[in-house]
């Protein structure tokens, strides 16, 4: 597969402070982005949702829907290259299946389209060990991740069972909410991307985040990672810092029941190496930063007349996010922030936690078995290494998460 190109190379540090972001006003349907691949993604999602709006929703999905795809090749020398490349290809995998999944996750196609096409997605400084790069939609509701062709194949392998599982649990799960999978081709560069619901809030800033696997071998953030404004910390960091998750017994019971069910499903599919992503919002800290930002904004008043605060750009219809009633500090809409849990009343700090399973597309194949054998030789048979078999992995994962809650 060709290198991901600029989609991940122009990465900016994400700010933990709740600064009001500004962007230059952009008319609807321009799809202007700094990266031509992002422009093509915006164009493609817009095209796809428009096409699907004319297709009748079937009573049930058919086996062929899980193999289907739609693709389009555009050769148009009249395009303004400042907005769009003149030659590109866009492919969407299993469009009917992902439309059905969006519906089951309570996501309206029009809202999905607006979030991904109104303004360019924002780069995110998170980077997976695999080299995958991330963007978030401008309104922070969705995450766009580059994936490999092997990931696409694995997604096809599990999609039917994943869909059935989502049907059975009525969309109530800690698993990634897969919402669309696409291939983009521009100037000989080919990349694959998958869109999921953001684990974190579009409104409540996260000041600390952890990627937890239940393993202790080589599970500490590097010095380079820790130097970031919002580093992704790991299991040993969580333990060594004495970090705690303060949720009440009822929320803990509900969370662990969902987690157990989800992880058993992953083990059945022989999937492993997934993580629990944990984000922590500090309510008082966020309030203080909001006050500081408002004071700074007051000083900068009138300096940038050509920009508009984040939200609905001009010349476009209202967004459901911005039309909802204002929420108090630390409050959230559970229909949007589906992974959010409040701390209990006696917690030392008022916090909101965002917790969900991520990175589920690693199958326990020969490659992982070889890695496990090599790590066992290096660290010893009893070491808590991450490449154990799926049943061992799921048990250790559940034990660790149950222990830290």
Curated annotation (Swiss-Prot):
Catalytic activity: a 1,2-diacyl-sn-glycero-3-phospho-(1D-myo-inositol-5-phosphate) + ATP = a 1,2-diacyl-sn-glycero-3-phospho-(1D-myo-inositol-4,5-bisphosphate) + ADP + H(+); 1,2-dihexadecanoyl-sn-glycero-3-phospho-(1D-myo-inositol-5-phosphate) + ATP = 1,2-dihexadecanoyl-sn-glycero-3-phospho-(1D-myo-inositol-4,5-bisphosphate) + ADP + H(+); 1,2-dihexadecanoyl-sn-glycero-3-phospho-(1D-myo-inositol-5-phosphate) + GTP = 1,2-dihexadecanoyl-sn-glycero-3-phospho-(1D-myo-inositol-4,5-bisphosphate) + GDP + H(+)
Residues bearing the modification Phosphothreonine: 3
SUPFAM superfamilies, A to Z: SAICAR synthase-like (SSF56104)
Activity regulation comment: In rod outer segments, activated by light.
A GO MF label: 1-phosphatidylinositol-5-phosphate 4-kinase activity
Domain of life per record: Eukaryota
Post-translational modification: Phosphorylated in tyrosines. Phosphorylation is induced by light and increases kinase activity.
UniProt KW keywords: Acetylation, ATP-binding, Cell membrane, Cell projection, Cytoplasm, Kinase, Lipid metabolism, Lysosome, Membrane, Nucleotide-binding, Nucleus, Phosphoprotein, Transferase
Tissues expressing the protein: Detected in rod photoreceptor cells.
Function: Catalyzes the phosphorylation of phosphatidylinositol 5-phosphate (PtdIns5P) on the fourth hydroxyl of the myo-inositol ring, to form phosphatidylinositol 4,5-bisphosphate (PtdIns(4,5)P2). Has both ATP- and GTP-dependent kinase activities. May exert its function by regulating the levels of PtdIns5P, which functions in the cytosol by increasing AKT activity and in the nucleus signals through ING2. May regulate the pool of cytosolic PtdIns5P in response to the activation of tyrosine phosphorylation.
Protein's name in the database: Phosphatidylinositol 5-phosphate 4-kinase type-2 alpha
Organism listed in the record: Mus musculus (Mouse)
Upper taxonomic lineage: Eukaryota, Metazoa, Chordata, Craniata, Vertebrata
Protein encoded by which gene: Pip4k2a
